[in-house]
């Protein structure tokens, strides 16, 4: 199992390859706001653990294992963002909130959150009802 830090790199590499068709050390460093030498060290570790294939100066390619995990990590992140929107978290806080919790939830919890997102998306009245509860609670606290 990858560590939370490894997950961040795999997720970002997956997104870059999906968006650009490739992922360079400099692109990964910029996206994660880290030094390129840190990226190189992590990429070498991910190569050793068979999440990707890395050749210095030639770029990198995710292995089947890396692609599968990358896809699952992107799904988890997107699902948690959807969940935050449904429960009414301010848009400007969603990304940081998701980054703060995504590595601490079990895959079972992610699956149950997925069920809840699906439940709310199947009937918009449910979201409206939730908003009504939130408004009532805000009025009580004022």
UniProtKB/Swiss-Prot annotation:
Residues given in the record as Mn(2+) 2 binding sites: 11, 77, 99, 102
Matching Pfam families: Fe_dep_repr_C, Fe_dep_repress
Cross-referenced InterPro entries: DtxR_MntR_Metal-Reg, Fe_dep_repressor, Fe_dep_repressor_sf, HTH_DTXR, HTH_tscrpt_reg_MntR, Iron_dep_repressor, WH-like_DNA-bd_sf, WH_DNA-bd_sf
Primary location recorded for the protein, binned into one broad class: cytoplasm
GO CC, any one term: cytoplasm
GO molecular function annotations of the record: DNA binding; DNA-binding transcription factor activity; manganese ion binding; protein dimerization activity
Residues of the HTH dtxR-type domain: 1-63
Keyword flag Transcription regulation: yes
Residues spanning the membrane: none
Signal peptide start and end residues: none
Residue sites binding Mn(2+) 1 per the record: 8, 99, 102-103
Summary of activators and inhibitors of this protein: DNA binding is strongly activated by Mn(2+).
One of the protein's GO biological processes: intracellular manganese ion homeostasis
Subcellular location: Cytoplasm
UniProt entry keywords in alphabetical sequence: Activator, Cytoplasm, DNA-binding, Manganese, Metal-binding, Repressor, Transcription, Transcription regulation
Highest taxon in the source lineage: Bacteria
Family statement drawn from the similarity comment of this UniProt entry: Belongs to the DtxR/MntR family.
Summary of subunit composition and partner proteins: Homodimer.
Role: Central regulator of manganese homeostasis.
Protein name: HTH-type transcriptional regulator MntR
Species of provenance: Bacillus cereus (strain ATCC 14579 / DSM 31 / CCUG 7414 / JCM 2152 / NBRC 15305 / NCIMB 9373 / NCTC 2599 / NRRL B-3711)
Gene that encodes the chain: mntR
């Amino acid at each position: 199992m990858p560590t939370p830090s490894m997950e961040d790199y795999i997720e970002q590499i997956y997104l870059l390859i999906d968006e650009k068709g490739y992922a360079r050390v400099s692109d990964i460093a910029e996206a994660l706001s880290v030094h390129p030498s840190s990226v190189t060290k992590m990429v070498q570790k991910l190569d050793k653990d068979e999440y990707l294939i890395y050749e210095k100066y030639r770029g990198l390619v995710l292995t089947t294992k890396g692609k599968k995990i990358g896809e699952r990590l992107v799904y988890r992140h997107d699902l948690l963002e959807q969940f935050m929107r449904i429960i009414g978290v301010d848009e400007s806080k969603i990304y940081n909130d998701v980054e703060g919790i995504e590595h601490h939830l079990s895959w079972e919890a992610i699956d149950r959150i997925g069920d809840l997102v699906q439940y709310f998306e199947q009937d918009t009245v449910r979201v409206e009802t939730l908003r009504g509860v939130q408004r009532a609670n805000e009025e009580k606290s004022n």
